[in-house]
Amino acid sequence: MLTTELNTTDVPAVFSRFVSVIDDKHWMSQVKLCNEEIRGNRLLDRYLHSEYAIAYQLSQMTELTRRYGSIPRQYCQDAAIYPAIGFAVQVLSAVEGFGRVDGELFRRRVHGAFKNPADMRGLRLELSVATHFIRRGDHVTWPETTGVGNFDLFIEGLGKDGLEIECKSISDDKGRNIHLRESLDFFGVLKPQIESTIAGL
């Protein structure tokens, strides 16, 4: 069901298919929003690039495609794009494997993941776990497409009744009372006032 291997020579074709299935407006608009936030608070730069890494990598590929008509071969060798192109090929194989109705539901889930880093982490974790079991030769189903169960993945043939998997991703902020984003926003407001105070000393 999921593609588990990809050759770098396939990157331009995979990206082109991904754009046609998912539409680059979803990551381009998110990157635009992030860049506007960064202009307002430079302290958010590293944080937002990390939280929206897949969107930023895909936006670079979109820009290259617009400039050159396709992703240049030397850029396909850049390991910095591997997480995004790996995500793209997995999403494509999942959408194609689900059928029309379930594929559309999955597409919408991908659209939402570009707007919410926690959703993106969860989706990538599910795809990673599914890839592990598929490479072992197991058959994986998403209960959200079958309407049976409220777990994330079902591995048929493991144990007596199969294996239900619930994927949980944890961010650096999990369990903290004050999250990094809130701290950076606060420091962004505070920084100009501190700088003006220091300048007067």
Label each residue range with its predicted role.
Residues 135-156:
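A short acidic/basic microdomain associated with nuclease active sites
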Residues 1-46, 60-96, 170-201:
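Metal-dependent nuclease catalytic core centered on acidic motifs
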